[in-house]
Amino acid sequence: MKTQLEGRFKFQVTRPDGTSRVISDWSPNLILDAGLNRIGSGGFLTHCMVGGSSAAPSVGQTTLVTKYADSSTILTDSVGLELASNYCYIRRTFRFAAGVAAGNLSEVGVGWTETLCFSRALIVDMAGVPTTITVLGDEILDVTYEFRMYWPLVDGSATLTVDGSSYNIVSRASNVGDWHLSMMAQFVGSGSNSINSFNFGVNAYTGGVPADLGGITVDPSMAGSGSGTLSYGSAYVNNSYERSYVGYFIPTPVVLPITAVKFTTVLGIYKLSIDPAIPKDNTNTFSVNVKCQWARRVI
């Protein structure tokens, strides 16, 4: 189950008389390798940095090339959903007080310290061409970063062996209309939250047939048979871009044959069908291991 990630920047300045103007509209950025790794171990969206280099972004970078200023002042947070385009998003606006970011700026980044970058980009003009913008000494600079998560549109498949018997597994994104509510809002918070911080849960279902798993906009339509405990597997391994979860169902209350399982995680809501049903009674503990993966979206 792999979630694709993307980000965009927007720049606006406010003059002393209160009037505002957009000086660089929405443009894509490069999520760095350091940023992809940071998702597996900690928060990543607490600081914004601006600087003066025109060097092209590359995945191995970890900081701005020529940093001038940084801000951890968060003006606004919002989350949203674009069902037709298959993503949900966080928008966080960082404010640089008048004079803090004054000068000629050509690069920008967001990250989790005053220097370490989750992403880096060159500032571009309205045509998308790298440019230099000028912020005057009496102007306030607001930089908005939009972080997107795209849910997978293709099913995964696997074979599960339990007590010598084989079961066919189909995995799929679930209830994508709630992704921005159940996970993205948690990411926003103080900005310090990460995949390690939230452990939402796991549910088992019984009855029905694999087709009852349903499409990506709904939860499984089988009968619910109880909730379990979701915990993390091994510690994050650098450059793996994945975390493992283990769903546990103790002897009670889940005592029915299991035909589907739903996982709710920071990286999305996912479900899987199990065919044939896995038998379970009040003497069994059932556990299932899954991996959530993430990747840089190709822009």
Task: Please annotate each region the language model reported.
Residues 1-105, 112-299:
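Small cysteine-rich, disulfide-bonded extracellular modules of the LU/uPAR three-finger superfamily
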